[in-house]
Amino acid sequence: MNIQIFGTKKCNDTKKAERFFKERGIKYQFIDMKEKGMSKGEFNSVAQVNGGLSGMINWDGKDKDLLALIKYTADEDKLEKVLENPTVIKTPVVRNGKASTLGY
């Protein structure tokens, strides 16, 4: 099992997901979205399972200006904006092979 948790160190839901796996003795790999982010392929595979691009975006996030920019950007440019600003993605993203979940 190769479990990956994409999130930020400050996110409470990401901390809950990490604690879930630690308590059960399950090994996982943590990827900090602020430092590394997700590749286009990783993002697309997770988005496919979780409701597409708009399902991956945390519309209740703090940066309302950036969210408005993404909302009104042309569809072909939205993906690039989201990948440039990974803090707008719902966290945690937990991946295990092709299966993935969003949020805790």
Name each model-derived stretch.
Residues 33-104:
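Thiol/selenol-based redox catalytic cores and closely related redox-interacting motifs
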Residues 1-33:
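Local sequence-structure signature of Cys/Sec-based thiol-disulfide redox active-site neighborhoods
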